Structures are given as structure tokens and as C-alpha cells.
């Protein structure tokens, strides 16, 4: 087990009331969050699930150069609409290169590099994330079957390989605009994300 459950409390939001569970990752001391809505204890049902990687600029500062904030809001709304589900807030900012390096990558994108080229220029792979803590959270909460809100094929592969049964992948295509269209096209072209390519 790579993480420990630390605390939990009710979290009223503008979408509905969630149970917020905080976990601490032993390797990094980072706190990861599970937002649980409704009853997810019936192991016969597939739980509507979203792994949302931390994006301070999109989630909290309303940046439109990515689709993260739009996806966070949409995922919470879909979970409430479903009647139950879970959103794991995965504390690996900037595909796990950290906030400072993400802003460095933004500066490189401002002069013409795409999101993958910028990461490589800084010495990182296109995606540095490790989803093992998310798998631990699913296992801790005894979630074995899920309907996954994602456009990312890597998440599907990692979870399937870990024994989490994905009964359905649900696209989350929201928030495209003139400021992030190139970024989204790059994720489709170079990272294989299930996204429409638009110019």
C-alpha cells in the first residue's frame, strides 16, 4: 500500500454534497483526494469514475489554455447526474512535472513548441504521471468495476492491467477554444487521446 487514509468529511459543493476523503502518499507525502457521491458500496455495479490530475491553472485560476477546469466541472456534474460515483483528485500537477516546470513549458509553447515538445525540451517525457496511488484508492474503497470518464487511453490500460474492470469508457470532450485547440490536437495526434482534431 502506497498511501494511508488520513481524514474525511462532508463537502457541500454547488453540484451536490460529496464525501471528501484525504489520503497521504507515503513516498511523497502528497495528499490525494477522493470525492465520493452517493452509495458506491454495491460491488455488482460499475461506479462512474474520474481520475482528475491536478491543474492549478485550469481548476482554480480558470485558465482556458487547457481543458482541465472544464473537465473537472463536467465530471462532477455527470457523477451527480448518475446518482453516485467518485472523482479522484490526483495530485500530480502538470502531468507530474510540477507547477514551475509546467509554467516553463507554457513559455515554450508561447514561442511555438507543442505540449509534448515543450516537455521533451525540459527533459521530461510527454507524460510523467504514475497512477498507482489511484489504483490504491480504488482498492481501498473496494471499487472493482468502473465506468471511466476519460479521453486518455493510458488510463484505461493502466487500470485494466491492475485488475480494475472498465465496463465503459465515457468521453469527456468539453472546453475547446481558440487558446487550447492546438494543445488538444497535440494530445490526439501525439498521445493518442480520444479527441476530435479540429483546425
Swiss-Prot record:
Needs which cofactor?
Answer: Zn(2+)
Entry annotated with the keyword Cytoplasm = no
Q: For this protein, what reaction is catalysed? A: GTP + 4 H2O = 2,5-diamino-6-hydroxy-4-(5-phosphoribosylamino)-pyrimidine + formate + 2 phosphate + 3 H(+)
Superkingdom assignment: Bacteria
**What's a Gene Ontology MF term here?**
GTP cyclohydrolase II activity
Membrane-spanning parts: none
What note does UniProt attach to the cofactor annotation?
Answer: Binds 1 zinc ion per subunit.
According to its UniProt record, in which pathway does this protein act? Cofactor biosynthesis; riboflavin biosynthesis; 5-amino-6-(D-ribitylamino)uracil from GTP: step 1/4
Q: Where does GTP bind?
A: 50-54, 71, 93-95, 115, 150, 155
Its EC number(s): 3.5.4.25
**Matching InterPro entries, A to Z?**
GTP_cyclohydro_II (IPR032677), RibA (IPR000926), RibA-like_sf (IPR036144)
What biological process terms from GO does the record include?
A: riboflavin biosynthetic process
**Sequence positions that bind Zn(2+):** 55, 66, 68
Query: Gene Ontology cellular component?
Result: cytosol
Q: Alphabetically list the UniProt keywords.
A: GTP-binding, Hydrolase, Metal-binding, Nucleotide-binding, Riboflavin biosynthesis, Zinc
Tell me the subunit arrangement. Answer: Homodimer.
Functionally, this protein is described as follows: Catalyzes the conversion of GTP to 2,5-diamino-6-ribosylamino-4(3H)-pyrimidinone 5'-phosphate (DARP), formate and pyrophosphate.
As for family, the record states:
Belongs to the GTP cyclohydrolase II family.
The name of this protein is: GTP cyclohydrolase-2
> Which organism was this protein described from?
Buchnera aphidicola subsp. Baizongia pistaciae (strain Bp)
Gene name for this UniProt entry? ribA
Amino acid at each position: 500500500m502506497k498511501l494511508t487514509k488520513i481524514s474525511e468529511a462532508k463537502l457541500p459543493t454547488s453540484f451536490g454534497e460529496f464525501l471528501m476523503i484525504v489520503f497521504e502518499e507515503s513516498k511523497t507525502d502528497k495528499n490525494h483526494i477522493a470525492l465520493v457521491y452517493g452509495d458506491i458500496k454495491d460491488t455488482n455495479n460499475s461506479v462512474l469514475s474520474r481520475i482528475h490530475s491536478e491543474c492549478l491553472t485550469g481548476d482554480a485560476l480558470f485558465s482556458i489554455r487547457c481543458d482541465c477546469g472544464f473537465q473537472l466541472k463536467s465530471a462532477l456534474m455527470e457523477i451527480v447526474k448518475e446518482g453516485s460515483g467518485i472523482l479522484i483528485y490526483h495530485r500530480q500537477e502538470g502531468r507530474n512535472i510540477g507547477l514551475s516546470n509546467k509554467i516553463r513549458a507554457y513559455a515554450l509553447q508561447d514561442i511555438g513548441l507543442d505540449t509534448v515538445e515543450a516537455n521533451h525540451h525540459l527533459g521530461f517525457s510527454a507524460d510523467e504521471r504514475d497512477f498507482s496511488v489511484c489504483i490504491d484508492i480504488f482498492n481501498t474503497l473496494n471499487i472493482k468495476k468502473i465506468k471511466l470518464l476519460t479521453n486518455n487511453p493510458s488510463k484505461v490500460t493502466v487500470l485494466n492491467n491492475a485488475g480494475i474492470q472498465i465496463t465503459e469508457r465515457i468521453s469527456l470532450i468539453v472546453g475547446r477554444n481558440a487558446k487550447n485547440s492546438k494543445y488538444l490536437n497535440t494530445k490526439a495526434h501525439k498521445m493518442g487521446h480520444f479527441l476530435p482534431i479540429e483546425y
